[in-house]
């Protein structure tokens, strides 16, 4: 059985969560500090883990007053984003505060979810993206949120962990081409997701 799967037993009641919510939020902010990478001026990748997904479920249940009986749907939605030990998963967000500017910018980014990659020593791992919801409209407008999976082989996991290798994360979309270097601290944090 996959011990990375989130079960109902992993989620505490809304009352219990309400008592620790403030401290849990501070803990998560610290935990996520080295799991975020900006790629260019408006795209950010937030790398997920079992803990970040449990936190998301707890927050959703608390804010929306979801009962334990109703949590099955949330678990089904969030479990695919828990890294399986041979991948990294990320939520990519296009973050533009001004609504008009955001709308215009997203209208040029159709298919961006197909253009996100991790580069290790020249080898490119393009993201698989969640296909259950169409993230690009028929008019070519991209969503501001994308859920990505980067699948690794044993050799690529070893290369990722090797501090002598430079790791980059990039987007090679014609309207948004950017590349960022992964710091050693971020690499160290993300490497914990591999079994």
Where are these regions (language model features)?
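Long, contiguous binding/interaction regions
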Residues: 1-87, 95-195
């Amino acid at each position: 059985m996959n011990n990375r799967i989130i079960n109902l037993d992993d989620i505490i009641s809304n009352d219990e969560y309400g008592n620790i919510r403030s401290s849990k939020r501070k803990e998560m902010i610290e935990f996520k500090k080295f799991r975020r990478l900006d790629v260019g001026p408006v795209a950010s990748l937030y790398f997920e883990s079992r803990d970040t997904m449990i936190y998301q479920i707890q927050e959703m249940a608390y804010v929306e007053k979801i009962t334990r009986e109703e949590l099955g749907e949330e678990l089904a939605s969030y479990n695919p984003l828990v890294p399986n030990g041979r991948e990294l998963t990320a939520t990519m967000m296009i973050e533009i505060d001004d609504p008009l500017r955001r709308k215009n910018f997203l209208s040029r980014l159709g298919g961006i979810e197909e253009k996100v990659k991790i580069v290790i020593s020249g080898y490119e791992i393009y993201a698989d993206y969640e296909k259950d919801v169409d993230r690009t409209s028929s008019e070519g407008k991209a969503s501001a949120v994308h859920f990505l999976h980067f699948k690794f082989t044993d050799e690529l996991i070893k290369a990722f962990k090797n501090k002598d290798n430079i790791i980059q994360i990039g987007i090679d979309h014609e309207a948004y081409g950017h590349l960022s270097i992964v710091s050693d601290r971020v690499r160290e944090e993300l490497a914990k997701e591999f079994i």
